Amino acid sequence: MEPGMLGPHNLPHHEPISFGIDQILSGPETPGGGLGLGRGGQGHGENGAFSGGYHGASGYGPAGSLAPLPGSSGVGPGGVIRVPAHRPLPVPPPAGGAPAVPGPSGLGGAGGLAGLTFPWMDSGRRFAKDRLTAALSPFSGTRRIGHPYQNRTPPKRKKPRTSFSRSQVLELERRFLRQKYLASAERAALAKALRMTDAQVKTWFQNRRTKWRRQTAEEREAERHRAGRLLLHLQQDALPRPLRPPLPPDPLCLHNSSLFALQNLQPWAEDNKVASVSGLASVV
């Protein structure tokens, strides 16, 4: 038979050493709280060593003792001692008084993990619950039943616009034409005379000044456009008039090149020069 086909019963037996963990923990000074012997009273071998795996955690004794109870597994395959990273809390016995069924030994079984409770598990559950509560808090308020648009918060109602009488508006306009800004005493006196509040007079003057500035800016812009159009018209009038149209060619000049050239130069001559030249010709 090949060495790789050997079963678990054909594995070589490891001889115990005198300074191992089993000998130190199983001394006479810890009769009740130390690490006890394994199943069948064996202190060495596969069932005598302490196992720290999760499946051996259900055998922990009361008051934080590390001694495994009967039914807990020992050393894993190969004689390796496993120490748990966290000490699990003791599991209370079942309510019916039935004996707890031990899970399968070794790390491959999952029966011992069913009832284990670690401190970090409680904190994780508490953290997840807090996060869920915080996430659902905006939706936990009371919502009105109906159309989705009806569930929205109704908008604030606007304050109705104050209307003044014709006599009040005329007096305010007359005062605004004389004085654009009012002092506190003048505003109070005008409000008392018109049977208005100080805030109403102040608001009316503010709105009227805004309207006055807008009208003034529009008037200035219109004047600027009118001035631009007037300047353009004056520039067009200041430009020289176009030249006279050329005279029809004389049939006599068409047969003489010199007379034809002289006739072509005649439109560029000024009226006074033409008159002087004609006068000189008549004198001669």
From Swiss-Prot:
GO terms for molecular function: DNA-binding transcription activator activity, RNA polymerase II-specific; DNA-binding transcription factor activity, RNA polymerase II-specific; sequence-specific DNA binding; sequence-specific double-stranded DNA binding. SUPFAM superfamilies: Homeodomain-like (SSF46689). SMART domains: HOX. Its main location: nucleus. Residues 87-96 have a biased composition (Pro residues). Residues 157-216 bind DNA. It holds the Pfam family Homeodomain. Keywords: Activator, Developmental protein, DNA-binding, Homeobox, Nucleus, Transcription, Transcription regulation. Residues 1-50, 78-106, 139-166 are annotated as: Disordered. PROSITE patterns: HOMEOBOX_1 (PS00027), HOMEOBOX_2 (PS50071). Disulfide bonds: none annotated. GO terms for biological process: animal organ development; enteric nervous system development; mesoderm formation; negative regulation of dendrite morphogenesis; positive regulation of transcription by RNA polymerase II; regulation of transcription by RNA polymerase II. This is T-cell leukemia homeobox protein 2. The lineage of its organism: Eukaryota, Metazoa, Chordata, Craniata, Vertebrata.
